Amino acid sequence: DVEIFAVGVKDAVRSELEAIATPPTATHVYTVEDFDAFQRISFELTQSIWLRIEQELKSIKVKSLTPPRDLSFAEVTSSSFRVSWSPAAEDAIAYLVNYTVALGGEEFVVSVPAPTTSTVLTNLFPKTTYEVRVVAEYPEGESPPLKGEETTLEVRGAPRNLRVTDETTDSFKVGWTPAPGNVLRYRIAYRPVAGGERKEVTVQGNERATTLYNLFPDTKYHVSGVPEYQSGPGTALNGNGATEEVVGEPKNLRVSEPTTSTAMRLTWDKAPGKVQRYLRNLHSRSAGGDIKEVTVKGDTSTTVLKELDPGTAYTLSVNPLYASGAGTAVTGEGATLQERGSPRDLIIKDITDTTIGTSWTAAPGMVRGYRIAWQSLFDDKTGENHVPGDTTNTVLRNLDPETKYRLSVYANYASGEGDPLSGEATTEASPDGKIVKISEETETTMKATWQPAPGNVLNYRVVYRPRAGGRQIVAKVPPAVTSTVLRRLTPLTTYDISVIPVYKEGDGKTRQGSGTTLSPFNAPRSIKTSEPTRSTFRVTWEPAPGEVKGYKITFHPEGDDGYLGEMMVGPYDSTVVLEELRARTSYKVNVFGVFDDGQSPPLIGHETTTLRDAPRSPIPSSGLDCTTKAQADIVLLVDGSWSIGRPNFKIVRNFISRVVEVFDIGSDRVQIAVSQYSGDPRTEWQLNTHKTKKSLMDAVANLPYKGGNTNTGSALKFILENNFRPGVGMREKARKIAILLTDGKSQDDIVAPSKRYADEGIELYAVGIKNADENELKEIASDPDELYMYNVADFSLLTNIVNDLTENVCNSVKGPGGLNPPSNLVTSEPTPRSFRVTWVPPSQSVERFKVEYYPVAGGRPQEVYVRGTQTTTVLVGLKPETEYYVNVYSVEGNEISEPLAGTETTLPIPSVRNMNLYDIGTTTMRVKW
């Protein structure tokens, strides 16, 4: 082999030099900057070359020395083994044995003088591989090594100190001190010493004990424990153990075949284990009783106790006897029989539909209790009660109604039951079973229905007759049928009906009921009560079919017929408010249809008044002040019928106050009269009664509630003839206005009176509330309906129309002779923030103009005023791109005209145009647009 040193000069690549040179590169590769730098590395390079020459010479010399041969190992244990070899050359001085753990660790050296060629290496680790090198020593040096490997054995041994504890009849626990070394498992073998099957179990090597189960009782066992290693089994540890004898108690001690005199049989289930004998004890429970003991063979499980006292209770015990001693005794009780008897004098009482009460005279002797058995004679149902021996009565419950039962009372003694005391009884019919239900009533028929009677019914006998007296009618109904139609009855007549089930033995329990045939007059329908207050509530119904002439309403507190209220309303009324009721009281209401020849059956409803009235918010003031020099005569016609009620009439008064408060009241301004109507109209005050607003408002606040039917047509005619006439304040040149407030449909004609209002130039407003007929309101009101007709669903909603109504009535007061509005509205010159408004003034001169404007989308109105000679103005401060409402009014003093209306939209903000950049520098520029 050639050993190469590489020297690189200047630009030589070191990686190429390292690839060329012999390893290691640290002593075989050198680099210099140029040829002049050789002096720097010459000493180091020369020294490396000489060192390698010396090493090679020594290696050549060693190779010439003869090494030992044939390395072998023997006598391997867990901590030692023997190393042997064949001798080297005759001039070998000694042998050096070097050994170390093969995976790395401290190296040990043993010197063996020649000519010895074997040695034992000791104190080794168990189950460990060692690397061994043997070198022959010569005067000239050491030979090359002879190498080999050997592995020590694992540690193996025997467990110690075998222990047997926790012995039972079929198990004991085996424990031991662990065996040395790495035990994989322990194999525990055991068999009876007297001979038998050998069994074994294994446990983990880290366990120190195990329990052997399913052993024979009272048996000695030979036990052996062997540790198992990876390399094989260790040494066994032997010992003995024994199970305990089975000791227990007999089970299920039973007494049978007792007699009235001297004997009873005692039987038990055998005790476990090898019982030698049973010890039987017998002890009378009476004071001073003797204890009798007798033993029987261990294979016996029954015996007869003799020479006993009659009617006597005994305490009994059976105790098993084993070789090791007594087991546990089983105990019980038994008694000889007594003489038995029967109760007497059975009494049956307090019978209901599901119960029967019974009592009897006590049976003789020591009765422990009574069993009362019952059986239905109609079917297979049975049952029984139990009572203590000192009780002589009971109630049989959960029986079937209307059923015949056989009852038997048995006296229960310690020795059994005596003969029964028997009797029979029949339960009553159930509450529903006693009733005949009536349905499908007509004027001449009704249907009778009843619950089926139990048992074998032959038929039902149906008997009915008028309660007021008359001929009795009898019908027969088959047993499978439980209803029938009674025919040929008199209208509006109450009948008493009886249904009797008929049996072979006789009649059963009677079922009774009553029913009334219908009136030939139909009742109203669908009654509804609502709006309860402390003293009122509303009753509403659907009209009765036919030529009804009116409705009668009666009402009284539930359960108190003595306080009966009654009222009548017309045929077109279908609602009424009942008044002057008790607070927090349930009322029953009857609504009858009244016809020419009689009245219908009642339509019945119920309602409860409240403890206190709910607070009502007053209708707010409209805030309008109707300022005008015009004269007007206004007549309010107010519906005061029963359908309104006092609580709602308070709202009506408040509504009237909000309407009339806007006017300037006086003989030269506005005059207001009020008439109230129901069945017959009446004037509350005339046009000229109140000269001031205060006087008028006081009168409205105290307007009384009239009550009655809704006759709107006659009321309209009434105010034409009684309120719109000169003698009571009507002025010829004043504008004439009528306002009707009603909550129902008129029961008389309204077409002709309404036409008279139009003919006489009277403006007529119609305000309908709740139950008002909208078509009727349109017929009454002046045209157009949008201006003169109002209809709200409830009195509380009057607040929603008070402003519109007041404003429209104010305009009617002003009339067409007021200020004329400007005309010909033109908008122009729109910008993003403004536009111009221009108009043509009215024919008459005005003091000034008011221009009102606000966004169409919503917002607070703004206004500007200009002189009466000016007909244009610019509205500024507006929002860009926004549509505005514009109203222009003529203004003269406190009078203001109707508006001249229009719209205009502002322009959007324009974008920048013609932008130029100039004077551009490094950090600045100018912008022009």
From Swiss-Prot:
Keywords: Cell adhesion, Collagen, Disulfide bond, Extracellular matrix, Glycoprotein, Proteoglycan, Repeat, Secreted. The lineage of its organism: Eukaryota, Metazoa, Chordata, Craniata, Vertebrata. GO terms for cellular component: collagen trimer; extracellular region. Gene3D superfamilies: Immunoglobulins, von Willebrand factor, type A domain. GO terms for biological process: cell adhesion. PANTHER family: FIBRONECTIN TYPE-III DOMAIN-CONTAINING PROTEIN (PTHR46708:SF2), TENASCIN (PTHR46708). This is Collagen alpha-1(XII) chain. Type XII collagen interacts with type I collagen-containing fibrils, the COL1 domain could be associated with the surface of the fibrils, and the COL2 and NC3 domains may be localized in the perifibrillar matrix. Could play a developmental role in regeneration. Pfam families: fn3, VWA. SMART domains: FN3, VWA. It is found in: Secreted, Extracellular space, Extracellular matrix.
